[in-house]
């Protein structure tokens, strides 16, 4: 396998929210075709990233109406799972691997991300296991001292896989939890915590910086990058600009726009 390429770029603003999701899909395809692994870091400015299940909330319009007052903009992602918060204190990390000459089970793929995080932060004990009262709970939630700091999902396209982690690094994690709890309470009313949606308890989650003081997203990027000393570093925008054929990327952007049409419709209905 080729040496890994590490991609990063400045914080995505609201008008660019579709970009990292479209880019991830293109990177997965490219990884499979070129047998090229990638490590992709990205952040959104004040977003709530929704799963498709979130768009089926009984009171979706009421749920979405809770977000603007807190300054967060919803975006529906192109992978499974439930809602997570994204802001300047949250780092999203995608480990993208070719599957052309190797097979990775779902659990094996999750383990690769878990081991990467362990390598980067050897001074703390990080455990896996679902934190049921966190937002977007899953079997491979990452926790320190019983509090969730990160969640992992994955997406497979043809001969590539993206193992995607969101890591709460610093900032107001309690406030993030309240934001998501309010979202589901508005969307479910008296059915809060049922129908496959989590009974979010903000105290079930914490920041990495709560255990490693002064930790920042920039420091996390340095630590994770140090695991790959021979990596080539690129700006994601430069990588996109050098694509000979941008039609795949444009197609993925269009798919994201279509997926998010439901958000636009709900907003229009509320006017």
What is the role of each PLM region?
Residues 124, 159-271:
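Long, positively charged amphipathic alpha-helical accessory segments at protein N-termini or as interdomain linkers
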Residues 1-101:
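N-terminal lobe of the biotin/lipoate ligase/transferase fold
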Residues 128-149:
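Beta-rich nucleic-acid/ligand-interaction surfaces
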Residues 19, 23, 59, 105-113, ...:
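Short amphipathic alpha-helical segments
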Residues 146-154, 162:
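Aromatic/basic-lined ligand-recognition segments
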Residues 62-66, 70, 116-124, 223-231:
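Generic non-transmembrane alpha-helical segments
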Residues 74, 123-133, 231-235:
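Short, well-structured beta-strand/strand-turn elements
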Residues 91-132:
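Contiguous, small/hydrophobic- and glycine-enriched helical/loop subdomains that border
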């Amino acid at each position: 396998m080729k040496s890994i390429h590490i991609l990063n770029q400045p914080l995505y603003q609201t008008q660019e929210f579709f970009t990292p999701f479209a880019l991830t899909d293109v990177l997965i395809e490219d990884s499979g075709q070129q047998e090229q692994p990638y490590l992709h870091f990205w952040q959104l400015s004040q977003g709530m990233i929704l799963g498709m299940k979130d768009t089926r909330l009984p009171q979706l319009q009421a749920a979405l109406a809770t977000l603007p007052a807190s300054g967060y903009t919803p975006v529906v992602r192109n992978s499974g799972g439930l809602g997570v918060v994204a802001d300047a204190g949250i780092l999203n990390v995608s480990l993208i691997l070719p599957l052309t000459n190797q097979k990775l089970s779902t659990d094996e793929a999750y383990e690769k991300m878990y081991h990467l995080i362990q390598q980067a932060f050897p001074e703390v004990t990080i455990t896996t296991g679902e934190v049921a009262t966190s937002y977007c709970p899953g079997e491979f939630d990452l926790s320190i001292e019983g509090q969730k700091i990160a969640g992992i999902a994955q997406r497979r396209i043809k001969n590539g896989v993206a193992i995607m982690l969101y890591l709460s690094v610093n900032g107001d994690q309690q406030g993030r939890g309240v934001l998501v709890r309010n979202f589901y309470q508005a969307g479910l009313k008296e059915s809060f915590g049922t129908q496959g949606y989590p009974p979010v308890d903000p105290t079930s989650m914490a920041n990495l910086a709560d255990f490693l003081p002064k930790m920042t997203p920039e420091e996390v990027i340095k630590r994770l990058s140090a695991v790959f000393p021979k990596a080539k570093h690129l700006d994601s925008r430069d990588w996109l600009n050098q694509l000979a054929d941008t039609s795949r990327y444009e197609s993925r952007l269009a798919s994201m726009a279509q997926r998010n049409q439901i958000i636009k419709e709900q907003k229009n209905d509320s006017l």
